[in-house]
Amino acid sequence: MSDNGATMLSSNRIANSFALVVALAGGAVCLGPARADGPSFDCRKASLPVEKAICADPRLSAIDALVAEAFTGFEPAFGGDKRKIARALIADRNACGQDAACIVSAQNNALQTYGNAPSWVQDYNIALIGKKALDTAARHPGSLDQPLPSSIGQCALTHITALTTRLGDDPLETAGPEAGSLARFSNGGAGVSYEREPGLASSKAGDPVVMCLISISRDCPQGDERGRVYYGVDLTIKGTWVLPDSQHLCGGA
């Protein structure tokens, strides 16, 4: 991952992916290639709920095969143990159970970590997690704040408390694009961008939001846990974003 979050999806890509949410809800969308030769493991021996979910879905199977392939060429950026990093990523995936949005988020995070994330996987990730975010809002209308998500694929309701430039010194609505963006939320979360984030540009303090954790950096210097990435949707204006919670990802300045 880049230091300033440049691996995040572009605003246009996010908007296009969000447009797929409605189609996904109706079961009328097909994204990207799906391999016919199954996942990286023997489905006859699948025992975990996540393994059974992957085996039952050709697209999840294709993504699993991509993860296994990407791992072979992976070299840790900070001298960490390659297999230890992989075990942490697999644990993230296994914790998802049969939740497809969670599984794809965890697998896309693994592909990002290994340096080989196809655009269709990223788009599929945002489409699924976007649908899950709206489903979360529908199940809890008018709900009070929920705790900041702590595991990949988890979503929670919250509210915007402040919208400023990246350094927090000016209101976002009157700032130029070069000043960046910083959103703070009532559950203690944040979203930071070096650019003027279109998904937040028309938002207001007090707007209800659903945040979903989609990435936890695993290839990091010891003790550096910066750079968790969240998908967010403003439930008032339906603006969306994908942003890290700090100016620098782990290993950065």
PLM regions and their residue ranges:
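N-terminal targeting/docking segments
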Residues: 2-5, 31, 189-190
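N-terminal alpha-helical modules
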Residues: 34-164, 179-180
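Cysteine-centric segments in proteins
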Residues: 120-253
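Selective for proline/serine-rich intrinsically disordered segments
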Residues: 7-8, 31, 37, 145, ...
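Bacterial N-terminal signal peptides that target proteins for export
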Residues: 3-21
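C-terminal segment of classical bacterial N-terminal signal peptides
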Residues: 24-34
